[in-house]
Protein backbone atom coordinates (compact mmCIF):
# COMPACT_ATOMS: atom_id res chain seq x y z
CA UNK A 1 0.00 0.00 0.00
CA UNK A 2 1.15 3.51 -0.76
CA UNK A 3 0.09 6.90 0.54
CA UNK A 4 -0.97 9.28 -2.21
CA UNK A 5 1.84 11.67 -1.28
CA UNK A 6 4.30 9.06 -2.61
CA UNK A 7 2.77 9.04 -6.10
CA UNK A 8 4.97 10.87 -8.58
CA UNK A 9 3.25 12.47 -11.57
CA UNK A 10 5.26 13.36 -14.67
CA UNK A 11 3.12 15.52 -16.99
CA UNK A 12 5.56 14.93 -19.85
CA UNK A 13 4.38 11.29 -19.97
CA UNK A 14 1.15 12.47 -21.63
CA UNK A 15 3.08 12.62 -24.90
CA UNK A 16 2.97 8.79 -25.00
CA UNK A 17 -0.81 9.02 -25.15
CA UNK A 18 -0.77 11.85 -27.67
CA UNK A 19 1.54 9.82 -29.93
CA UNK A 20 -1.15 7.12 -29.77
CA UNK A 21 1.33 4.34 -29.01
CA UNK A 22 -1.47 2.01 -27.83
CA UNK A 23 -4.00 3.05 -30.47
CA UNK A 24 -6.63 4.29 -28.02
CA UNK A 25 -6.03 8.04 -28.03
CA UNK A 26 -9.26 9.90 -28.81
CA UNK A 27 -11.02 6.55 -29.34
CA UNK A 28 -11.57 5.18 -25.83
CA UNK A 29 -13.40 7.36 -23.27
CA UNK A 30 -10.96 6.12 -20.59
CA UNK A 31 -8.11 7.64 -22.61
CA UNK A 32 -7.06 11.20 -23.35
CA UNK A 33 -8.31 13.59 -24.36
CA UNK A 34 -11.78 12.52 -23.14
CA UNK A 35 -10.46 11.20 -19.80
CA UNK A 36 -9.30 14.68 -18.83
CA UNK A 37 -6.27 16.90 -18.84
CA UNK A 38 -3.12 15.95 -16.96
CA UNK A 39 -4.08 18.39 -14.21
CA UNK A 40 -7.66 17.10 -13.94
CA UNK A 41 -6.53 13.49 -13.72
CA UNK A 42 -3.86 14.28 -11.14
CA UNK A 43 -6.41 16.18 -9.04
CA UNK A 44 -8.81 13.23 -9.29
CA UNK A 45 -6.12 10.81 -8.07
CA UNK A 46 -5.01 13.08 -5.24
CA UNK A 47 -8.58 13.09 -3.95
CA UNK A 48 -7.88 9.64 -2.50
CA UNK A 49 -5.75 8.92 0.57
CA UNK A 50 -4.22 5.55 -0.25
CA UNK A 51 -3.44 3.33 -3.17
CA UNK A 52 -3.09 -0.40 -3.32
CA UNK A 53 -0.39 -1.19 -5.88
CA UNK A 54 -0.83 -4.48 -7.73
CA UNK A 55 1.66 -6.30 -9.92
CA UNK A 56 1.73 -9.43 -12.03
CA UNK A 57 4.67 -10.79 -13.98
CA UNK A 58 4.85 -12.86 -17.12
CA UNK A 59 7.62 -14.53 -19.01
CA UNK A 60 8.26 -13.65 -22.62
CA UNK A 61 6.53 -16.80 -23.88
CA UNK A 62 3.06 -15.62 -22.88
CA UNK A 63 0.76 -13.50 -25.03
CA UNK A 64 1.14 -10.02 -23.53
CA UNK A 65 -2.42 -9.01 -24.43
CA UNK A 66 -3.89 -11.96 -22.56
CA UNK A 67 -1.58 -11.38 -19.59
CA UNK A 68 -2.52 -7.69 -19.38
CA UNK A 69 -6.22 -8.55 -19.67
CA UNK A 70 -5.90 -11.14 -16.89
CA UNK A 71 -4.13 -8.58 -14.69
CA UNK A 72 -6.87 -6.00 -15.25
CA UNK A 73 -9.61 -8.55 -14.55
CA UNK A 74 -7.94 -9.49 -11.26
CA UNK A 75 -7.68 -5.80 -10.35
CA UNK A 76 -11.36 -5.32 -11.08
CA UNK A 77 -12.29 -8.41 -9.03
CA UNK A 78 -10.29 -7.14 -6.06
CA UNK A 79 -11.96 -3.73 -6.36
CA UNK A 80 -15.35 -5.45 -6.24
CA UNK A 81 -14.30 -7.29 -3.05
CA UNK A 82 -13.20 -3.97 -1.54
CA UNK A 83 -16.62 -2.51 -2.36
CA UNK A 84 -18.31 -5.46 -0.65
CA UNK A 85 -16.22 -4.62 2.45
CA UNK A 86 -17.42 -1.00 2.48
CA UNK A 87 -14.78 0.76 0.36
CA UNK A 88 -17.28 2.04 -2.17
CA UNK A 89 -15.42 5.10 -3.48
CA UNK A 90 -12.58 3.68 -5.56
CA UNK A 91 -10.47 4.78 -8.48
CA UNK A 92 -8.77 2.14 -10.59
CA UNK A 93 -5.68 2.89 -12.65
CA UNK A 94 -5.31 -0.12 -14.91
CA UNK A 95 -2.48 -1.64 -16.90
CA UNK A 96 -3.48 -0.05 -20.17
CA UNK A 97 -7.03 1.22 -20.70
CA UNK A 98 -9.58 -1.32 -19.55
CA UNK A 99 -13.31 -0.78 -19.83
CA UNK A 100 -13.92 2.60 -18.17
CA UNK A 101 -10.62 2.67 -16.23
CA UNK A 102 -7.80 4.90 -17.40
CA UNK A 103 -4.29 3.53 -17.35
CA UNK A 104 -1.45 4.78 -15.19
CA UNK A 105 0.13 6.37 -18.27
CA UNK A 106 -2.94 8.54 -18.81
CA UNK A 107 -2.56 9.69 -15.20
CA UNK A 108 1.16 10.31 -15.89
CA UNK A 109 2.23 8.20 -12.90
CA UNK A 110 5.92 7.31 -12.74
CA UNK A 111 5.73 3.51 -12.50
CA UNK A 112 9.39 3.08 -11.54
CA UNK A 113 9.15 5.45 -8.58
CA UNK A 114 5.85 3.89 -7.54
CA UNK A 115 7.38 0.40 -7.65
CA UNK A 116 10.43 1.57 -5.70
CA UNK A 117 8.20 3.12 -3.03
CA UNK A 118 6.46 -0.21 -2.37
CA UNK A 119 9.50 -2.45 -2.81
CA UNK A 120 8.50 -3.97 -6.15
CA UNK A 121 10.63 -4.41 -9.23
CA UNK A 122 9.72 -2.52 -12.36
CA UNK A 123 12.48 -2.70 -14.97
CA UNK A 124 14.98 -5.53 -14.64
CA UNK A 125 16.96 -7.79 -16.93
CA UNK A 126 15.32 -11.04 -15.79
CA UNK A 127 13.37 -11.53 -19.01
CA UNK A 128 9.96 -10.89 -17.44
CA UNK A 129 7.29 -8.32 -18.18
CA UNK A 130 5.58 -6.60 -15.28
CA UNK A 131 2.08 -5.16 -15.24
CA UNK A 132 0.99 -2.66 -12.63
CA UNK A 133 -2.37 -1.30 -11.61
CA UNK A 134 -3.62 0.66 -8.65
CA UNK A 135 -6.79 0.84 -6.63
CA UNK A 136 -7.04 4.21 -4.93
CA UNK A 137 -9.35 4.51 -1.94
CA UNK A 138 -10.29 6.58 1.08
CA UNK A 139 -10.10 5.35 4.68
Language-model segments: which ranges?
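Acidic helix-start/capping segments at beta-turn-to-alpha-helix junctions
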Residues: 5-10
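Cysteine-cluster motifs in flexible loop/terminal segments that predominantly coordinate metals
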Residues: 11-41, 97-108
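N-terminal [4Fe-4S]-dependent radical SAM core
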Residues: 18, 24-27, 45, 119-122, ...
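Ordered, amphipathic secondary-structure segments that act as subunit-interaction surfaces
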Residues: 41-82
Amino acid sequence: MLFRSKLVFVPEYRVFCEENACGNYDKNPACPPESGTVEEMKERALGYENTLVLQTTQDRLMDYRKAKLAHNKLTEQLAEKMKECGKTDLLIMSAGPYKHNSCMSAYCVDAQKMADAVGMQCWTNDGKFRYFSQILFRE
